[in-house]
């Protein structure tokens, strides 16, 4: 009934309205003459319904033969869930719900002198609450711990913590230049029992009558998990190394967004409600921001966005 795919366009210089803020530099001594220089960038887009809160932690360690950067990606991705009538003759009793089947988070660089050496989370995670720690020890040793609190043996550590009720986290793509995660709809608890995310009757209910609004054809807000009803608060980490003495600056693209499904509900007065589903009706609805990192001055610049 409705199919559309929107791909991310070219990253343009700053032109369209976004909100940007920068936090003050914070320096933490981590022992043995090493220190971590911390920067934070906040970039928001009303167009995409996304806020990127990105922490850039530069590790200065004379015992490590490379520059190191820990990037923690936080913020908010609005679900953009909506309910509407389907226009056209013969569709008067058909309503639709557009909702996020998947949230997308990713980091990419094309710099030949930069390598992605660690990231969190790594494996498929099905628990509602996600918590992991990335630790650093003097000399360039990065390690991950399974849960928050396991950081006593590290000179420095960063944690991730987020909630994903009814969703699972997976690494969709990973290599030395990029990592992309998908937080995907999995299984939902409904008044009728557990339902797969692929069940076409998921969220569909019978309205009180044929004159009901589009919202009445679908489950009320108190039956929708937070990632459907409001949105997702990501918390992901990547660790990058940079060849010392090569380039002064590197660029990274960080993307937050969603893939949207459409569920159609049609009321037939004699037989009742009928559901149809368009999986991945809108994909890669992502806000992509290009950041420039200066390895010498430890400055961060927002260079462009879509």
From Swiss-Prot:
The keyword Signal applies. Pfam families: Leukocidin (PF07968). Disulfide bonds: none annotated. One of its GO terms (biological process) is cytolysis in another organism. InterPro entries: Bi-component_toxin_staph, Leukocidin/Hemolysin_toxin, Leukocidin/porin_MspA_sf. Toxicity requires sequential binding and synergistic association of a class S and a class F component which form heterooligomeric complexes. LukEv (class S) associates with LukDv (class F). This is Leucotoxin LukEv. The gene is lukEv.
